[in-house]
Amino acid sequence: MQGPLLLPGLCFLLSLFGAVTQKTKTSCAKCPPNASCVNNTHCTCNHGYTSGSGQKLFTFPLETCNDINECTPPYSVYCGFNAVCYNVEGSFYCQCVPGYRLHSGNEQFSNSNENTCQDTTSSKTTEGRKELQKIVDKFESLLTNQTLWRTEGRQEISSTATTILRDVESKVLETALKDPEQKVLKIQNDSVAIETQAITDNCSEERKTFNLNVQMNSMDIRCSDIIQGDTQGPSAIAFISYSSLGNIINATFFEEMDKKDQVYLNSQVVSAAIGPKRNVSLSKSVTLTFQHVKMTPSTKKVFCVYWKSTGQGSQWSRDGCFLIHVNKSHTMCNCSHLSSFAVLMALTSQEEDPVLTVITYVGLSVSLLCLLLAALTFLLCKAIRNTSTSLHLQLSLCLFLAHLLFLVGIDRTEPKVLCSIIAGALHYLYLAAFTWMLLEGVHLFLTARNLTVVNYSSINRLMKWIMFPVGYGVPAVTVAISAASWPHLYGTADRCWLHLDQGFMWSFLGPVCAIFSANLVLFILVFWILKRKLSSLNSEVSTIQNTRMLAFKATAQLFILGCTWCLGLLQVGPAAQVMAYLFTIINSLQGFFIFLVYCLLSQQVQKQYQKWFREIVKSKSESETYTLSSKMGPDSKPSEGDVFPGQVKRKY
């Protein structure tokens, strides 16, 4: 009973908020905390704060003003060398790292222009900086040696780049561990920038996470992953950025390079390494934030990649890295390992086939109509109500809701929260539809197997007991686990569907492949059982017409049970375009086959349709008779030539 009350209640709340908003248009005496009144009509958040809705001027009474963290992307205030940014409520400040202080003696400053941080430690620190300076100068000469890179082949270039990356990491970590008392070291030139941080004791509550910044790129890593449980000696983390290396190991080294896409590298190449233990597993993924080399729209394809070394050379790979957030200036990635990283972007993505789009929308529209008619038939036709029609009804409802949401919501990528909800709902509805297809296959097999013993009652009891918990419960558990584990992978930049990152698509494809494989096996078993049964009957029973009808219904069951979805996995190679058309045409008409087989070709349903048709005609005839009688009046008598509906004029 709560469902009918929900919509009026929601409308009431919206109207209440609208009335409150209208009243506040003439006065903003009650702006939220950290906000000020503008022209006595609107509120605006104070400097250092932003509204929850993103609007500069607002009147909504429940709006909030949240603190802006200027030290993180997309703001990322740059404090200069040997300094870090600290966020405070409504503001921020820069401060020299330990071992450095301002020339003026002040504790804080506002930006890199005010940075006069000077070294105050012993000569060992100077030696450490000198060592780092030698490293960056040495490798700068290698990176800028155009003759070296032009004379080498593709495989030699990747191998040389891999060697350089490993050597820089090793030498930088070695330098940082020589003098761990110098907590932070920063150095850079035109080609390489380095920051190292050393840990000499256990992780504290204040330093659970370390943040390193070089050339507007940053990395967040857990302290426990740096020390790896080793409390006997110092540990260090190094973060290195290469300004020009991306021109050498560019997007042509991407292992998933598609000739149809113009992919380019849109960030500096960065490396991350920890020591003294090198090849270690991380308890939690590191977060990397890249500043774009070119400001680009956030709707482009974005790939978080790392430099993967193999026996045949090295290349950019997405394994273990996935996208968290992207805007015009920055990209944020999560990676489950340490290596060298970058951001690749697709300048132009593959255009959609307009013919396939038309086929999809027309086919799904026809399916929606057929599924609606089928669902109404199963609901209203009392003569055919049983376990079988209950299965048909649930399958029809799930497919109807899934197709309807697909048509109206698949492209609604903004706001992102709504897009994620749509993606999650589509995930659940299509999984539920496939689960009901599996139950259809199981019921069909059990019915065929028990033809000889006529044990329908036990089948019905079994299906009634398991079908609803399985049909709706199993998909709910699958989606709940997926959403709890990877909520950010619901919704992409151009579709409200599942991300391809981290193999997340297999949370849908895995169950689907298992279901249509099981249904294909069940279909073959049913076909074999029916063939044996029919061959044992009197030859007169199996007429040519009945055989043809049986063959047609059996073929249609392939579509209804979802076995044709395997065509979606065959869209590779030269036949990809043909398979795409077959997959789209066949599966967009699944609803039509359900209505055709379970309704139009069912004798019981045909009789019910005929009964309904006669009742409609009779009702219409009686209505016309009543209307005509009303026009003639109670005292009127029909003339000899008048013939009422349903009467035949007799000749004597």
Swiss-Prot record:
- Residues making up the signal peptide according to the UniProt record: 1-21
Q: Where is this region: GPS?
A: 304-351
Q: Which GO terms describe its cellular component?
A: extracellular region; ficolin-1-rich granule membrane; membrane; plasma membrane; secretory granule membrane
An example of a GO molecular function for this protein is: calcium ion binding
Query: What Gene Ontology biological process does one annotation of this record name?
Result: cell surface receptor signaling pathway
| Topology in the lipid bilayer | Multi-pass membrane protein
Q: Where is this site: Cleavage?
A: L338, S339
Keyword DNA damage belongs to the record: no
Q: Which InterPro entries match?
A: EGF-like_Ca-bd_dom, EGF-like_dom, EGF-type_Asp/Asn_hydroxyl_site, EGF_Ca-bd_CS, GAIN_B, GAIN_dom_N, GAIN_dom_sf, GPCR_2-like_7TM
Disulphide bonds in the chain: C28-C37, C31-C43, C45-C65, C71-C85, C79-C94, C96-C117, C304-C333, C321-C335
Q: Which residues form the GAIN-B domain?
A: 183-351
Where do glycans attach?
N34, N39, N145, N189, N202, N250, N279, N327, N334
Region annotation Disordered: residue ranges? 621-652
Query: By its UniProt entry, which CDD domains does this protein fall under?
Result: EGF_CA
| PTM remark | Proteolytically cleaved into 2 subunits, an extracellular alpha subunit and a seven-transmembrane subunit.
Which residues are in the EGF-like domain? 24-66, 67-118
- Intervals, Cytoplasmic compartment: 379-389, 438-464, 530-557, 602-652
Q: Which residues lie on this side of the membrane: Extracellular?
A: 22-357, 411-416, 486-508, 579-580
Other comments on record = Has no murine ortholog.
Briefly state the protein's biological role. Answer: Orphan receptor that may play a role myeloid-myeloid interactions during immune and inflammatory responses. A ligand for the soluble form of this receptor is present at the surface of monocytes-derived macrophages and activated neutrophils.
| PANTHER family cross-referenced by the UniProt entry | ADHESION G PROTEIN-COUPLED RECEPTOR E3, ADHESION G-PROTEIN COUPLED RECEPTOR
Quote the protein name from its UniProt record: Adhesion G protein-coupled receptor E3
The protein's organism comes out as Homo sapiens
Name of the gene this protein is made from? ADGRE3
